[in-house]
């Protein structure tokens, strides 16, 4: 979606799914099953995806928007650039990487491994007891 507006969708089953917002729109969806999920928020938009099941997930926020994910994935790559938030503490991943550049925040849940990189005042909060690869700042337990 580009610009403003709202999109809703439920009970989505597919191989690859790419969902993106560029602008101030909102996307709400639930009950998604796919192999490869790509999620992108650019601008001030908000995305909420509930009850997602995916093998691989890549989610990014650039700007002041918010992405909220719940469900499960085998592997996840999260990135925030700017002041946005990526809230995935109810999205259980076996293996995850989280990168924040700016003042944004990532909240995630990893069971086996979590790699964290931060620059600026942003932070990463996590659930689970994963093996950690992280810098000295910007990481906290939820």
What are these model-predicted stretches?
Residues 1-142:
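Extended, compositionally simple hydrophobic/Ser/Thr-rich segments
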């Amino acid at each position: 979606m580009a610009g403003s507006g709202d999109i809703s969708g439920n009970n989505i089953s597919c191989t690859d799914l790419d969902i993106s917002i560029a602008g101030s729109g909102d996307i709400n969806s639930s009950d998604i099953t796919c192999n490869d999920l790509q999620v992108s928020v650019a601008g001030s938009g908000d995305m909420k995806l509930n009850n997602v099941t995916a093998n691989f997930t890549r989610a990014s926020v650039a700007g002041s928007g918010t992405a909220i994910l719940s469900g499960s994935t085998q592997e996840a790559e999260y990135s925030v650039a700017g002041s946005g938030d990526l809230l995935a503490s109810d999205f259980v991943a076996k293996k995850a990487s989280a990168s924040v550049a700016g003042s944004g925040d990532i909240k995630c849940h990893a069971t086996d491994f979590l790699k964290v990189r931060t620059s600026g005042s942003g932070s990463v909060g996590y659930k689970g007891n994963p093996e950690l690869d992280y810098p000295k700042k910007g990481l906290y337990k939820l």
